């Protein structure tokens, strides 16, 4: 065969006559220059001298925060001080102690350049002083001892002896005490090991060295400086100050007598939620004319002139391009008696999880409905978001509702159309659990701004409507009772990296209060950290309380371990995390009966977690809560039941009886909400 002939006729001599050396390259035959060798070739003989790297110690950060608190600065000045310190540490590193940097910043009135110049000049003078002292001490040594005895010290090393130093009242072995020439760097004295003859000569020479260096470095300098730097007095003092704060009095002082209220705007997609609230913010003066003019021009170029006011709250390019709100937009405005935190929730069915996140943080709600013919019916009938949003906010604890009947100008402010909408909606909201006294209907027009911040003067409306405008109705809402006396709880809604050290989280404080310098515990990661700064409505503050939407700057923890949905609490009274819990659920309008092993999506605060219904324990009476049936085979629409759920990952939960805000959740399946529930018992 042909392939056999190729093998038998192969000339192997051609392979053996190959003169190429494959073990080295062609260039290795030539000499390499010393400069090239020094630049590109590694020599094992010349071992680089590696200096010991100082470990990051959290106590240093704690001491720096304590030193800042000793100066009793205001919240704004403290934020400026932290900013200056971060800038100076980027240039100087950790070579200069925080106390020196703080004194320099305060002395130069927060001018970073002057403070840096002062610190560098101080270090230069100190280094010259140390150099002069070193030459004087070596001169004294040369006089007190012959040169031969000094050179003979390099023959063998001195045997070190263990030195014990007292730190914070406890005796600990800190290192070795070696006789040698003492020197000073940055205010800390230390001993340098030197070589010398056997022990007898070493002791004799060390006596001379000690007498020579007595004036420059006393023998107890290390111990004294360590005791002074490790004194925990600032920590105790700051703790006492935190305990003495009267949170209720500070709340009144901070708000100027105005009460805080968290408002969420909900409704069917394209009902005009963003336009309505954006126009209200513009009329209140929160948006200046220049910015509004820019939005008008940009929306005209995009072919969406009517979306100009919506762009006040829809800030991302994708939201503006698609013309729908996708994430919860947050801003602040004030009424006569309230400070309102406004949350504009998305209305599209695909973004219901984001809407649940916003509704879970709200105290009251504004439900926006479209008064146009056919549009209201599309949003209110089966498949529309008006019904689902109403059920969601009621299930998440919202009891006060203002219904803004929007786009009334398109139906010429007809009283019949307004009464038709209020009749249908009023009946549904009453079934959902809202009291008639807590629901108000206001005719509005988001595009023209009619009946938003002032009562309408249009004759078509005033001839049959004599009620409040939308802003007056929002101002008349009653704020809920804040849980300031309960342990601290904050649910994370966003995590991001800050420019300085540490990272930032945002969220609403559900209970308790917090101050800068406090220690926090994150659950379920079970990691601790320290609050470096607090920001409320883009302004740095010293503390925040329940109901506030804040941004916290945290240090002492890795950002990778924190996710959206984590809950921060006090280390003394932590929140529990579990994967199995029992709950009482109310089932909505569902097509498929719920059975054992039914998969659901659990929405809790800002968490969205897959879960499974492990057990159907009993069916309960809606009004009395009594057990009507034990161990049911399935659950259908409208039933109230006790079930056991299991999640894939641990979730930090609270019992509904202890924390109502943190005891509610929603269950969704197949893109629709199927049940609302409250936590009754945690299993594991």
UniProtKB/Swiss-Prot annotation:
Catalyzed reactions: GTP + H2O = GDP + phosphate + H(+)
Main enzyme class: hydrolase
Subcellular compartments: Cytoplasm
Region: G4, residue numbers: 406-409
Region of interest called G1, as start-end residue ranges on this chain: 267-274
GO cellular component: cytosolic ribosome; Dom34-Hbs1 complex
Principal subcellular localisation of the protein: cytoplasm
Keyword RNA-binding found: no
Positions where Phosphothreonine occurs in the chain: 231
Record's compositionally biased regions (Polar residues): 212-232
One Pfam entry name: GTP_EFTU
Function: GTPase component of the Pelota-HBS1L complex, a complex that recognizes stalled ribosomes and triggers the No-Go Decay (NGD) pathway. The Pelota-HBS1L complex recognizes ribosomes stalled at the 3' end of an mRNA and engages stalled ribosomes by destabilizing mRNA in the mRNA channel. Following mRNA extraction from stalled ribosomes by the SKI complex, the Pelota-HBS1L complex promotes recruitment of ABCE1, which drives the disassembly of stalled ribosomes, followed by degradation of damaged mRNAs as part of the NGD pathway.
Name recorded for this polypeptide: HBS1-like protein
Species the sequence originates in: Pongo abelii
Gene: HBS1L
């Amino acid at each position: 065969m042909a392939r056999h002939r190729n093998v038998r006729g192969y000339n192997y001599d051609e392979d053996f006559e190959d003169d190429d050396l494959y073990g080295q390259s062609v260039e290795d035959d030539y000499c390499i220059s010393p400069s090239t060798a020094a630049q590109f070739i590694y020599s094992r003989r010349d071992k680089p001298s590696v200096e010991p790297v100082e470990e990051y110690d959290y106590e240093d950060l704690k001491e720096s925060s304590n030193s800042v608190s000793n100066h009793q600065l205001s919240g704004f000045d403290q934020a400026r001080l932290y900013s200056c310190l971060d800038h100076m540490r980027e240039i100087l590193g950790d070579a200069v102690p925080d106390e020196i940097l703080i004194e320099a910043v305060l002395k130069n009135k927060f001018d970073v350049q002057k403070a840096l110049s002062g610190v560098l000049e101080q270090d230069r003078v100190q280094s010259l002083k140390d150099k002069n002292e070193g030459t004087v001490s070596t001169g004294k040594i040369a006089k007190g001892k012959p040169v031969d005895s000094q050179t003979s010290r390099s023959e063998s090393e001195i045997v070190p002896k263990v030195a014990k130093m007292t730190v914070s009242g406890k005796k600990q072995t800190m290192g070795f005490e070696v006789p040698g020439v003492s020197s000073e760097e940055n205010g800390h004295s230390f001993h340098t090991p030197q070589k010398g003859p056997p022990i007898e000569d070493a002791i004799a020479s060390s006596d001379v060295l000690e007498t020579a260096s007595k004036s420059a470095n006393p023998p107890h300098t290390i111990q004294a400086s360590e005791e002074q730097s490790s004194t925990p007095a600032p920590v105790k003092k700051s703790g006492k100050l935190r305990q003495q704060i009267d949170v209720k009095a500070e709340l009144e002082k901070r708000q100027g007598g105005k009460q805080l209220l968290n408002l969420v705007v909900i409704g069917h997609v394209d009902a005009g939620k963003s336009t309505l609230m954006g126009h209200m913010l513009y009329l209140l003066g929160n948006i200046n004319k220049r910015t509004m003019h820019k939005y008008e021009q940009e929306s005209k170029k995009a072919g969406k002139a009517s979306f100009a006011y919506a762009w006040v709250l829809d800030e991302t390019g994708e939201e503006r391009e698609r013309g729908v709100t996708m994430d919860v937009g947050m801003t602040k405005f004030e009424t006569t008696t309230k400070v309102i935190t406004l949350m504009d929730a998305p209305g599209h069915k695909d973004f219901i999880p984001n809407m649940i996140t916003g509704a879970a943080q709200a105290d009251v709600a504004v439900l926006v409905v479209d008064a146009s013919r056919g549009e209201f019916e599309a949003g209110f009938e089966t498949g529309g978001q008006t019904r689902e949003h109403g059920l969601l906010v009621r299930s998440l604890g919202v009891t006060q509702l203002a219904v803004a009947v929007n786009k009334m100008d398109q139906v010429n402010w007809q009283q019949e159309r307004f009464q038709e909408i209020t009749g249908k909606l009023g009946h549904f909201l009453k079934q959902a659990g809202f009291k008639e006294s807590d629901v108000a209907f206001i005719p509005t027009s988001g595009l023209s701004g009619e009946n938003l911040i002032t009562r309408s003067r249009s004759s078509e409306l005033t001839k049959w409507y004599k009620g409040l405008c939308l802003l007056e109705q929002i101002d008349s809402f009653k704020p809920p009772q804040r849980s300031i006396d309960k342990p601290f709880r904050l649910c994370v809604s966003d995590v991001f990296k800050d420019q300085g050290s540490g990272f930032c989280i945002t969220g609403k404080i559900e209970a308790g209060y917090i101050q800068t310098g406090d220690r926090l515990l994150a659950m379920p990661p079970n990691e601790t950290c320290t609050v470096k700064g607090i920001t409320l409505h883009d302004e740095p503050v010293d503390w925040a309380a329940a109901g506030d939407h804040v941004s916290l700057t945290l240090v002492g923890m890795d950002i990778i371990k924190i996710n959206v949905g984590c809950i921060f609490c006090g280390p003394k009274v932590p929140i529990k995390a579990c994967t199995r819990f029992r709950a009482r659920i109310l089932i909505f309008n569902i097509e498929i009966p719920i059975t054992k092993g039914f998969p659901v999506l659990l929405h809790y605060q800002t968490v969205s977690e897959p879960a499974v219904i492990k057990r159907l324990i009993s069916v309960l009476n809606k009004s009395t809560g009594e057990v009507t049936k034990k161990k049911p085979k399935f659950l259908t629409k409208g039933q109230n039941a006790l079930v056991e759920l299991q999640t894939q990952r641990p979730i930090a939960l609270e019992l509904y009886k202890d924390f109502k805000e943190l005891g509610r959740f929603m269950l969704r399946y197949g893109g629709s909400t199927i049940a609302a529930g409250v936590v009754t018992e945690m299993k594991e």
